[in-house]
Amino acid sequence: FSTVPGSYTPYPGMHMQFLSGPAVSVQGAWFATPYWGFGGRMSCTNLRVKVNGVAQNDNLECASMYAGPYFSHPFSMRWLVGAKLLGGCEIYKPCRTDFRRLERRAGFSFGTGLSTTYLATQNLGVRFSTDYDVAPPVVRSSRERLHKLTFGMEVCAVF
């Protein structure tokens, strides 16, 4: 699931709070060495919205594509620790609120993440991850970037 801590003020008098919601992502990396690789992540997130303390009927839907370096280090026969540093694009679909409609928006974003992977078999793992993304403002006139925190558990192929 994904969450956006804090509150944001895209327009004067409009205080927005984004509540946790589901996130789905696909990611992969090619490792040129056992430790360093290059890869990417595509994700979709659906965040519930409150404006001035009132829950809204519409949700903020986001899609993103990132690419960058990945790092992996085995610390036992079955456990790996990993990290990544990514840059890319975040896209917001239009979102209706009681206060004002938020238009479609896209912009540069960057993120990082940490993970631990347990190798259940030689080629199958279970990964626990935490990602932190800095996404563009929800409106063009705002300078407040969204700070997204995503916690995940994944089944992954390791080869």
Segments from the language model and where they lie:
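Detector for outer-membrane/organellar transmembrane beta-barrel domains
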Residues: T3, T45, Q56-N57, A63-Y66, ...
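Short glycine/proline- and aromatic-enriched beta-strand/turn motifs that initiate or cap beta-hairpins
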Residues: F1-P34, F38, M42-N46, G87-C95, ...
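Repeated loop/turn-to-beta-strand initiation elements of outer-membrane beta-barrel proteins
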Residues: P34-G40, M77-V81, Y118-V126
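Residues that define the transmembrane beta-barrel architecture of outer-membrane proteins
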Residues: F18-V24, N59-M65, W79, R104-F110, ...
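Residue-level signature of outer-membrane beta-barrel architecture
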Residues: W30, F71-H73, T116-Y118, V134, ...
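A generic hydrophobic-segment detector
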Residues: D98-R143
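Membrane-embedded beta-strand positions of outer-membrane beta-barrel proteins
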Residues: V26-G28, F38-G40, A67-P69, A83-L85, ...
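Extracellular loop and loop/strand-boundary signature of outer-membrane beta-barrel proteins
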Residues: T9-M14, V51-D58, C95-L102, P137-R143
